[in-house]
């Protein structure tokens, strides 16, 4: 059995708490190097930088007493409103039940010495974002996740940035709305979509 655990920020194994998913032993399909990375610097930075000699993949998870695991999303995309760490998956699981919403992406925006949650939605062809849908989304998120998960802003966009293998890229959106540098733009299938997220009036107040 591969030595999977969940670590705290201090590198301690934790149970029934949310933290970083790690693996303390080799496992099948585990890469041992990157292409064009002769010194192994990128490889080490990607998987072994956070905890010395322990594989860290960047998943925010919880290890349960019965041996099961719950994955809450990417740890680099977790939300921290009021200093409380929240997983994005808890919000997505609510939104996917709304037929009016085709796709969504949720990020944290630095705001007033804190972080506020921003939800971007791509609506289905027959729908347009309105006050009724916003109200229903917030109500369901509040009841099925928690009051802390409720977005401060819900904004309609035409598309969502994704990698060439189809994964949505929360960190690229977060960096865009905060005016930070976007890493690995070349890995995006639709980088021009990020222009829509720049200087949005709704994020100025």
Where are the language model's segments positioned?
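Short arginine-rich
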Residues: 175-181
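General small-molecule cofactor/ligand-binding pocket signal
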Residues: 154-157
């Amino acid at each position: 059995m591969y030595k999977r655990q969940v670590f705290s920020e201090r590198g301690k194994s934790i149970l029934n708490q949310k933290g970083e998913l790690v693996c303390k032993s080799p496992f099948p399909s585990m890469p041992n190097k990157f292409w064009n990375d002769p010194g192994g610097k990128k490889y080490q930075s990607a998987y072994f930088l956070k905890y010395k000699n322990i594989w860290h993949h960047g998943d925010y998870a919880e290890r349960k007493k019965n041996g099961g695991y719950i994955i809450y999303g990417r740890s680099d995309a977790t939300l921290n409103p009021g200093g409380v760490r929240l997983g994005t998956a808890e919000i997505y699981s609510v939104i996917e039940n709304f037929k009016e919403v085709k796709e969504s992406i949720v990020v944290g925006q630095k705001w007033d010495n804190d972080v506020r949650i921003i939800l971007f939605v791509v609506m289905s062809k027959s729908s347009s974002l309105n006050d009724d849908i916003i109200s229903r989304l917030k109500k369901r998120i509040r009841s099925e996740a928690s009051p802390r998960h409720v977005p401060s802003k819900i904004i309609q966009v035409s598309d969502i940035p994704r990698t060439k293998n189809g994964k949505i890229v929360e960190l690229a959106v977060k960096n865009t709305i905060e005016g930070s540098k976007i890493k690995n733009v070349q890995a995006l299938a639709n980088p021009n979509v990020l222009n829509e997220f720049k200087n949005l009036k709704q994020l100025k107040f």
